[in-house]
Amino acid sequence: MIFSQGASPLKGEFSRIKFSIASPESILAHSRGEVLKPETINYRTFKPERDGLMCEKIFGPTKDWECYCGKYKRVRYKGIICDRCGVEVTTKSVRRERMGHIALAVPVVHTWFFRSVPSKIGALLDLSTKELERIIYYEVYVVINPGEPGEKQGIKKLDRLTEEQYFQIITEYEDNQDLEDSDPDKFVAKMGGEAIHMLLKNIDLDASAIHLRKVLKESNSEQKRADALKRLKVVEAFRKSYEPHKKTRKKPQGLFPEDELPEPYVYEGNKPEYMVMEVVPVIPPELRPLVPLEGGRFATSDLNDLYRRVIIRNNRLKKLIDIRAPEVILRNEKRMLQEAVDALFDNSRKANAVKTGESNRPLKSLSDALKGKQGRFRQNLLGKRVDYSGRSVIVVGPELKLHECGLPKSMAIELFQPFVIRRLVDRGIAKSVKSAKKLIDKKDPIVWDVLEKVIDGRPVLLNRAPTLHRLGIQAFQPLLIEGKAIQIHPLVCTAFNADFDGDQMAVHIPLSQEAQLEASLLMLSSHNLILPQSGKPVTVPSQDMVLGMYYLTKSRSRDLGEGQIFYSPQDVLIAYNEERVGLHAQIFVQYDGEIDQKFDSLRVLDTMTDLTAEKSAWLKAQIEKKCILLTTVGRVIFNQNVPKEIGFINRVIDKKVAKELIGRLSSEVGNVETAKFLDNIKEVGFHYAMKGGLSVGLSDAIVPETKARHIKSAQRDSTKVVKEYNRGTLTDNERYNQIVDVWQKTSNIVAEESYQKLKKDRDGFNPLYMMLDSGARGSREQVRQLTGMRGLIARPQKSMSGQPGEIIENPIISNLKEGLTVLEYFISTHGARKGLSDTSLKTADAGYLTRRLHDVAQDVIVTIDDCGTTRGLYVHRNIEEETSGQIKFREKIKGRVAARDIIDTLNNNVIVNSGEIITEELAELIQETAGVEEAEIRSVLTCESKIGICSKCYGTNLSVHELVEIGEAVGVIAAQSIGEPGTQLTLRTFHQGGTAQGGISETETKAFYDGQIQFEDIKTVEHTAINEDGVADLRIIVIQKNGKINIADPESGKILKRYLVPHGAHLHCKNGSLVKKDQVMFSSEPNSTQIIAEIPGIIKFADIEKGITYKEEVDPQTGFSQHTIINWRSKLRATETREPRLMIIDASGEVRKTYPVPIKSNLYVEDGQKVEPGDIMAKVPRNLDRVGGDITAGLPKVTELFEARIPTDPAIVTEIDGYVSFGSQRRSSKEIKVKNDFGEEKVYYVQVGKHVLANEGDEVKAGDPLTDGAVSPQDILRIQGPNAVQQYLVNEIQKVYQINAGVEINDKHLEVIVRQMLQKVRVEEPGDTDLLPGDLIDRSAFVESNQSVAEKVRITEKGDAPARIQDSQLHKVRDITKLNRELRKNSKNMIAFEPALQATSHPVLLGITSAALQTESVISAASFQETTKVLTDAAVAGKVDYLAGLKENVIVGKLIPAGTGLKRYKAIKLTGEGQESNATERVVEEPATREGFANER
């Protein structure tokens, strides 16, 4: 932005900001004068020195309306320039705006353009950074014009010469030096900034671009093409910075009031020589202040020191030039000046940075002022301090309403002081502001009355740090309270993640009318009951409230008055108040409203022993007719608070039921009723928790008597395992895994029994059990440790990369009630301490993940209603996922818009029409309809909006259950929804004390449904084995990998569930047979992969040599030897190679089948041994992830997926469908070939020792892994396309959150982020567009580039066309056809042409960090990371920031373009009744009514 001399800075509207390199002219245009002296202030007078760094003449007066010498004082002399001291009489605030300059004695290279990677200057001149450095720092001369002497000596332009070579030429050709510098025959070589300046000035960008494009097309050398491309990018950036200005000399719109720029400032684009500075700008003195300290010393900004060095060296150099000092001295001084300017602009890049005298730290340069957390962007522009705010400790306010908070009087009077003063003066209570202040200080009683009136209807905002999602700031209506702590409603604690152990909260006051309205309409706590991340309620009762409701609604048999029949709920209450009936008694009530059907009244009726058969039969009939209700007194009391529309809730109310109920209320009766209900159940909950007197004593933790028996049995089992190991039938790995399994099972059995014991104790009224069962406090895991056994403990890992933790195989048999032995205690401290240290370390990681997510998605805003796409996303029903507790089918489709009709295939009924929202009811219906296997829904991933996304593709806004409005910042909501639970994830291990759980390796797989078995791709062999009792046992063993067993419905043939059958599994069912639910279908060994003989024959070892490819380990305890394949590479010479494999040969010695054996395999056969089909020849051990609850694996996993990193040991994936064959073996790798029926073949090289999953002859599909390891998302994108990788990322991230933390995040949030990761494409062939090969550009920009050449042709032969038409040019088809018509008419040669070629590209998957840095907005990218690099690139290319996202608008201080800040709300007309107001330029003027504003919104 350019301000003319004397004009004040831009106050008006601007819509975009352009970045470019400052030319010397523009620096001088900004400047108010040259800084000539390094002095700042006079040490005696403390006044700024004239012409120094603080000079008043240049930068403006230090006192308002007063010149330096004091001749002019007072405002009446405004604008006069003093004739004595030359200072303009104005306000001192101009010292924040006015700039100066330093005129350099020699040109100096700007370090940003020289040191950036790749170096901009280096790319233009085709010099390496090392060579450039030698020229710039005056070590060598560079030839600018070889002239005649150069030609004779064979010297070319840009050659580097040493001092001797240079002087040799100069002395040899003395006459040559008399020629003018512009003479082409003169030999010119220079060094330093001057040389670079001349070279850059002489560059012809257009010619360079043509030459480099030619190299790209014609060169065969890969290196040359890569270099040319790197250079071309910089050349094109400079050329593009010219383009917009070639056509018009008008200014970019909105910067200046006039139509034209003032003449000197016509922007001509960047010239390369601007990268070398002749003038250095000096920033305003208020931005680098001198602050007086006590003791007469001054604290100064580092910039002043850096400027001082530049000025001192510059002045010294000028003097030396004047006195014609020797070249050596000059050169040294010039080099020092270059270094001083380098340090001023960027002091952190250099190894020898300028340090301060006393503390020896590097000085903060201009770059450092922008960079990092403490830089200008993040510290001051994105993180401003707020006035009208205060903070205090929070305490609970149980008597508050949901929308209220208690504000201490002392805080309120301070915050609302200006408003109170105004009221006091207006009402005549105080004469002046001063006297009003006195009244307030005296705490006059009238002040409190006024304060009450002032705060009436004025919301305040409460915020608790860290603000992880939007519910971390909510609005409340304040109530004045005594004391010094803020009171908050207990139900909003969950949203703030607050508790009352000393947490503090900040209060902010919305000042403007608009802010107050937005606070009370959008941010009021009673309007924010639903969590945006999942659409589930967030204001859910917890702890005491849950316990109270649970206690109230629980039934107890034989309580006072059981079996009585009441005429109405009112009668029940009267009887209870008269103590005729107990709180938990089961009674009958006549009820005519809706009834919640989840309670099995008839079953309970059968358990009531005191009823006669006759009475029982009558009651049964009445219950079935729904005239009478079997319930408890407590439930009647509870239902007094439930709105009639919901009906009678006849269940025990625990946390889960309460959450469900609040969710129903908010969608069925609205927020107002729900808020009332919440306040009522809060009262009820606290009241009955108090009445129940529920507290835990040691005797409530009951240890089951059977515990000792189970432990004995487990000890027997583990002894048996050890015996087998000693016999040599198990490897050490298998022994470990089996022992862990035994203890895991035992621990679970004991836990279940202790749980059942608690449940039966005192009729289910054991306080410990009630707390657990209601969900008030504690988990089954904690009860297991209290009353069962602590079980196995995880051994903490050293690394944080998230491999599965080892488990210590000695379990802790005691529980916490019995107390631990010293050894057990010592083992368990391990896990507990890790939990605490993890917590603190990992919170930072989660915070950084959130920041990256915000940055990548901050500009995703709903911009249009419907993008009109025909594409959608297919969602399949997956029973396996649903049973393992993952997200149900209905949750995935709820709140989305159907892309196609959803049809019930069984009867062809349309359930949902295309374009219709799938509501909760419809989703439930689809879930229940067996005929719907999949649905196609609109998704953000397939949205085709140019900017932002459309509301149809996003679906409903989860927090209001309606289609998302235009202007909703869905990107930020998505980032918060993923980041907030990320921070929760980190704290997971903390509460479990690091005990190991989960991960019992399931050896038997049971049927989930009744149905018919169908085999798919299953090959088997029969095998007879001798079992433990010495009896022969016939087994059917699967020898095919990736076989499946399907359970189908015998009538319709529809597949209900699919099971993957592992290689080596034993089948317990036949193809086509019927199975019952829970019948075992097959069993497998989970701890290892087996290599199984498929045919009979004799084993022959190939390349299996003792000490080279296998080692023999004799177990010291058992004396048995075990053969393990080892990595043989270190044992052999470089040329030698081995490939360990087992071969089966027949009697004639012919090889029938070969099996490669991976490293770490244990051999179970000897050379020459006879084998039968089904015999195990070798086992490859597997690592099982057994440690549950430790999210260390979770967060790094999420980060890895979001950053689209290639896994450490990725699987090799086939790119085509086909059949597998093995090729030759090399020293370190072997070949796997995949060939299809069309003769296409792909060869993959697999590292030796990597486990190959495919066998010779296996059929594979594109995208199938051929080896062990995780599949890389980049491979999925390359082979299966963008859709597959999007689905993969969303599902994998969901799994981590689901399994590791049980956190529910709606898919649409993940889709928003994944969409941002796939926004870019990489250009492959640019065709005739102006793109470059390898360019990374936005998909929409790529489409635009192709459209620009769509109707153009390239001239191949110009014929007799006019001179303006040349070969290879692009022209519009219609222009050329018109010309050709004329040429034909005149019988001339016509123009030959061909259609212009369009560019080709492939999609790119970027990690969130790269995606955030690649964003279109310069300001947003610069404030994220790598600030200097982003700004350098933007300046060279003359980029324009159109301020489309949220972040850039916050930085420049505008309203964000989301919500009420949208452009469409700029000129709202507000009308009261019977009056017409003018359109305002602000968002709102004075609203006539609140309702009016709400309707407008």
Curated annotation (Swiss-Prot):
Compositional bias of kind Basic and acidic residues: 1482-1497
A single GO BP: DNA-templated transcription
CC cofactor note: Binds 1 Mg(2+) ion per subunit.
Residues where Zn(2+) 2 binds: 867, 943, 950, 953
UniProt keyword annotation of RNA-binding present: no
NCBIfam families according to UniProt: rpoC_TIGR
Reaction(s) this enzyme catalyzes, per UniProt: RNA(n) + a ribonucleoside 5'-triphosphate = RNA(n+1) + diphosphate
EC identifiers of the protein: 2.7.7.6
Ranges for region Disordered: 1476-1497
Record's keyword terms, sorted: DNA-directed RNA polymerase, Magnesium, Metal-binding, Nucleotidyltransferase, Transcription, Transferase, Zinc
InterPro entries noted in UniProt: DNA-dir_RpoC_beta_prime, DNA-dir_RpoC_beta_prime_bact, RNA_pol_asu, RNA_pol_N, RNA_pol_Rpb1_1, RNA_pol_Rpb1_3, RNA_pol_Rpb1_3_sf, RNA_pol_Rpb1_4
PANTHER family registered for this protein in UniProt: DNA-DIRECTED RNA POLYMERASE (PTHR19376), DNA-DIRECTED RNA POLYMERASE SUBUNIT BETA (PTHR19376:SF54)
Positions that bind Mg(2+): 499, 501, 503
Subunit structure: The RNAP catalytic core consists of 2 alpha, 1 beta, 1 beta' and 1 omega subunit. When a sigma factor is associated with the core the holoenzyme is formed, which can initiate transcription.
Keyword rRNA processing annotated: no
One Pfam family in the UniProt entry: RNA_pol_Rpb1_4
Name used for this protein in its record: DNA-directed RNA polymerase subunit beta'
GO function terms (MF aspect): DNA binding; DNA-directed RNA polymerase activity; magnesium ion binding; zinc ion binding
Cofactor requirements of the protein: Mg(2+); Zn(2+)
Cellular compartments per GO CC: DNA-directed RNA polymerase complex
Family designation: Belongs to the RNA polymerase beta' chain family.
Binding, Zn(2+) 1: 67, 69, 82, 85
Record's function text: DNA-dependent RNA polymerase catalyzes the transcription of DNA into RNA using the four ribonucleoside triphosphates as substrates.
